[in-house]
């Protein structure tokens, strides 16, 4: 298992913490959010103290890497608010998709951040000049369109927000610093993301997926389905529609805004796509994601859509094929696991025992005080996971 080890909530206080940074805003910052916001501001201002006790020079660009549902928009607005109030920075918020800009604008108003900011499309021909450019879904920063935008705006500071910056080499070229903190598994355990069930099916074809969905539509609820090819998407759509389940295929050319509105309103039961909904799609009432067989990066992008919490859905669901290269349980442990065997779902009871042991261990660890021997601490070659910054 590769459950990411991340900053535990029981760790010692961070010397870079700015506890008053969200005062006056209608949010109660989560501990990891406060750490990330504080570290970002201090990196921009040249006040960041690294693990060696050295104060680092100001960074021109910082990227926040944090899972879907962890509140990246809130963190970005918090940083922008501080930089604008303290230094008078003009702020621009840029994204590839209009819905991301709309979400940022609504959060800014609703939460009382009151950041005076320009909303910028990544494809703007004449973008406004700003001092701080916030780049939503910053994994696109390696793309030529974003590089051109940088050249036109020439901001003093750039803040990137991303759940999964896979183009690691390109990202490192675009950002001076990359901040990581809590991963999906940790955020689920701490109650910030939804817990989930994991289902394994024998094969992943349009026919198989449609068959499983139509057999138990109430089990799956609002569902997002991913396929590799467009013809697979349309094949699955036809099968679902023939069975009386309203499904839509979302593409770059379809009326995506209307499709998403219909899905949220319950007029559409299922959305099918190749990859376009791996980003910028936020729907807490989404219950199930069918993830096509893929590697780790793409699997996390697809599955990550389902972890936003909803009061009526205590357990979300991820469905994968047994041949997938990266089962999601390698990223985050599921509360329950089911496998389709001999025409029925078989539960893996061991999961509940593992979860009980894990929770007990977490309680014991949280109540323990551990200190490294002075000699070991003085000569430690590698930082702890929560001390890392790149």
Report the location of each language-model feature.
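Walker A/P-loop
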Residues: 51-79
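Conserved Walker A/P-loop ATP-binding site and its immediately adjacent core
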Residues: 68, 73-108, 229-231
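Conserved helicase motor
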Residues: 95-100, 118-126, 140-143, 228-231, ...
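Conserved two-lobed SF2 helicase motor
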Residues: 108-132, 263-279
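Conserved RecA-like P-loop NTPase helicase motor core
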Residues: 139, 252-344
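Post-DEXD/H (motif II) to motif III coupling segment of the RecA-like Helicase ATP-binding lobe
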Residues: 140-193
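Conserved interdomain linker/interface between the two RecA-like ATPase lobes of SF2 helicase motors
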Residues: 178-235
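A conserved SF2-helicase RecA2
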Residues: 184-194, 308-389
